[in-house]
Each structure stands twice: as structure tokens, then as C-alpha cells.
Amino acid sequence: MYNTKYYTLQHLKEKNAILCTWKQFCKGEEYQEPFRYGLELIKKHNITTWITDATHGFENEEADTVWLLEEIMPKFIESSLEKIVFVIADDSPFMDEILGQKGALVEHFEVALVEELS
């Protein structure tokens, strides 16, 4: 487990998944760090599912969204990942952003939006 004031990153062995739980707004290096560390775990353990808990999420800075799509997504696509799950309430103020990300992801992954992690 990797824990900061911005997020917690966990390897859920029983689900063969990485769980990234956002706690508060961050940008730049603090935003990018869990994706880099998660990518290492994906490679090491052949992880098939990435779960983002956006319950306490935030609207990304545009530069971070560009970085995510240009730098990390190609590496995720080349990895063992098959599924991406977003934990988010139906009435979340960030739903539009998550739906935008989903639109970019469905070409390469199974994508699910759930209100709680089971």
C-alpha cells in the first residue's frame, strides 16, 4: 500500500486489481505519482483491473489530463490491464469528466462506473 495525503494506492490481490482512492485535490507530480507507481505494480503482478475511487475526486487540471492521455494511457494499453472501474456517485459533480475519460478508454478497455466497490 502507498498512502499520501492526496491518495491511497492498494494492490487488491483477490481482485488482481489496483485501487487508487483519491482523498483531495492535487496536480502535477502529486497527481502523476500514483499512476507511475501503479504502472510498476501492473507490470510486476500482471494486474488486469485498475479501480479509481473518485468519491472524493476533483476536476483535473488540463495539463494533468493531457499527461494522463498522452503518457500513461499508451503504457496502460500495452500492459496486462483489461478493465478500468470508476467508483463515483451518479450525482457527482465530476461525472462529466469521468464520462469523458470513459469515452477515451472504451476503445481499449472494459470500463465500468459503480457507486460503491463490492
Predicted regions and their residues:
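Amphipathic, Lys/Arg-enriched alpha-helical "gate/interface" segment within cytosolic domains
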Residues: M1-S118
